[in-house]
């Protein structure tokens, strides 16, 4: 699949900075964003999490930022107003068949973007470049911990 997957939803773009995200959320009537009280900082991981409720079609929205830039956005949709089949059909019409499909989720993926439709009804956009960096960093830390543990055990 070519890199044709969207990296934005209603003016919210993967890669945008926190202040831009807050401005867009404040101006969009689909979200009930309350400003800084909807923002949590995770200093140990240089990450921020913005969680807000939505109005009408969106029940909840989550935005995860790393080093100040948005890399995951997830929208839990209101199943009273929209259904899984309608969203799935719309995504297939726009982006073709998913790269992977199972009872829990449908995933469209390119080198830079993952778009996932999860059950019961959540749509996620993920910046794969940042996501893969996090996975690589975690593997490096785990490898160092394993080595350290082995060195400790070898001391006996």
Predicted ranges, named:
Residues 1-38, 42, 74-156:
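Non-cytosolic coordination micro-motifs
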Residues 44-82:
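Mid-chain, structured segments of secreted extracytoplasmic proteins
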């Amino acid at each position: 699949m070519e890199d044709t997957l969207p990296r934005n939803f209603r003016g919210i773009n993967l890669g945008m900075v926190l202040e831009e995200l807050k401005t867009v959320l404040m101006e969009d009537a689909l979200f009930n964003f309350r400003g800084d009280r909807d923002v949590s900082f995770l200093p140990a991981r240089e990450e921020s999490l913005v969680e807000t409720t939505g109005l009408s079609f969106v029940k909840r929205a989550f935005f995860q930022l790393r080093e100040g830039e948005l890399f995951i956005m997830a929208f839990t949709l209101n199943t009273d107003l929209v259904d899984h089949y309608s969203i799935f059909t719309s995504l297939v019409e726009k982006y073709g068949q998913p790269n992977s499909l199972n009872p829990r989720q449908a995933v469209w993926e390119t080198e830079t973007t993952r778009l996932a439709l999860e059950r019961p009804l959540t749509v996620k956009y993920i910046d794969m470049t940042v996501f893969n960096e996090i996975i690589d960093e975690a593997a490096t830390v785990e490898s160092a911990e394993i080595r350290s543990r082995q060195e400790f055990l070898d001391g006996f």
